[in-house]
Amino acid sequence: MREKLEALLADAVAELSQVSTEDGLQELRVKYLGKKGELTAVMKGLGALSPEERPVIGQVVNTVKGELEAKIESAGLKIREDIKAEKLRSERVDVTLPGRRRPIGTRHPITLVIEEITAIFAGLGFLVAEGPEIEHDFYNFEALNFPKDHPARDMQDTFFISDTVLLRTHTSPVQIRTMLKQAPPVRIIAPGTVYRCDSDATHSPMFHQIEGLMVDKGVTFGDLKGILTIFINQLFGQGTGVRLRPSFFPFTEPSAEVDIACVICKGKGCRVCKNTGWLEILGAGMVDPEVYRHVNYDSEIYSGFAFGMGIERIAMLKYGISDMRLLFENDLRFLKQF
């Protein structure tokens, strides 16, 4: 019986050395230690032994069983450690590898132009002012000297929400709001979104403007021309030709359209400038005394100028964009160029 137990232990240890999985280990445990296992079968034979042999062999059985259980437990621990090590190896992260590059967006050309224009005027001492896009008739028209029968007040040109509330058609209302809150001197620019009933290759029902205002004692038309010339030369390059043509705006007098030498043909004449050599980019003029009356400024003491430009038009000229609608279509093939 003793020899049989020793042989059984040797066989179990030999098989155990070949086991590499937890399932295999469980099969071996059942084979030798289960209810119908080989060691259990030996233990059932103890009853056939003499009273003298029974305690001796019983001691051997317990020793074999304890040793086998210990070896199985040790093998199980090693298998679990091997599994854990393999998992760690397979899931190892090489921190020296470069990270995956994510596609990076770019700023929209409209944003780029607004930022550049804002920076130029900041260098000239202008602050940025803002106002609501849903505006009252008083700020959008009345305080800016638009007569009641002015075409801009018609439904085909303006998005009216009610008889006196509308989507602002320009950012000039910001100038009125600023002057009502602030005594001179005033030096601001007002970038923002504006709305008009218009849509084609060169017009959009929603577009962007930057308007500027400077009010102080002794401000002249010469100051206006000087400021705009500096701005144009910084935006389009030194030496860019500038000319002012007489025009009319309800809120300025005198008024002027400001042209630059065509950025495409350098003033020689082409299809873009209709062979004139010039491109209109903004309107400007000296603030009308009637506007001062609405904001309680004394026009005998203070004078000033205002100007306004469409950002889309500036962007089209600066980047050579032929169709304004490209600026609003969110086509990444177009936007990635900036």
UniProtKB/Swiss-Prot annotation:
Biological-process GO terms, alphabetical: phenylalanyl-tRNA aminoacylation
Keyword Oxidoreductase attributed: no
Annotated Mg(2+) binding sites: 253
GO molecular function: ATP binding; magnesium ion binding; phenylalanine-tRNA ligase activity; tRNA binding
Alphabetical keyword list: Aminoacyl-tRNA synthetase, ATP-binding, Cytoplasm, Ligase, Magnesium, Metal-binding, Nucleotide-binding, Protein biosynthesis
Co-factor binding comment: Binds 2 magnesium ions per tetramer.
Pfam (any one): Phe_tRNA-synt_N
GO cellular component, one term: cytoplasm
Reaction(s) catalysed (UniProt annotation): tRNA(Phe) + L-phenylalanine + ATP = L-phenylalanyl-tRNA(Phe) + AMP + diphosphate + H(+)
Domain of life of the organism encoding this protein: Bacteria
Coiled-coil region list: none
InterPro entries, per the entry: aa-tRNA-synth_II, aa-tRNA-synth_II/BPL/LPL, Phe-tRNA-synth_IIc_asu, Phe-tRNA_ligase_II_N, Phe_tRNA_ligase_alpha1_bac, Phenylalanyl-tRNA_Synthase, tRNA-bd_arm
The species this protein was found in: Geotalea uraniireducens (strain Rf4)
Subcellular location: Cytoplasm
Family: Belongs to the class-II aminoacyl-tRNA synthetase family. Phe-tRNA synthetase alpha subunit type 1 subfamily.
Principal location class: cytoplasm
Alphabetized PANTHER family for the sequence: PHENYLALANINE--TRNA LIGASE, MITOCHONDRIAL, PHENYLALANYL-TRNA SYNTHETASE
Protein name per Swiss-Prot or TrEMBL: Phenylalanine--tRNA ligase alpha subunit
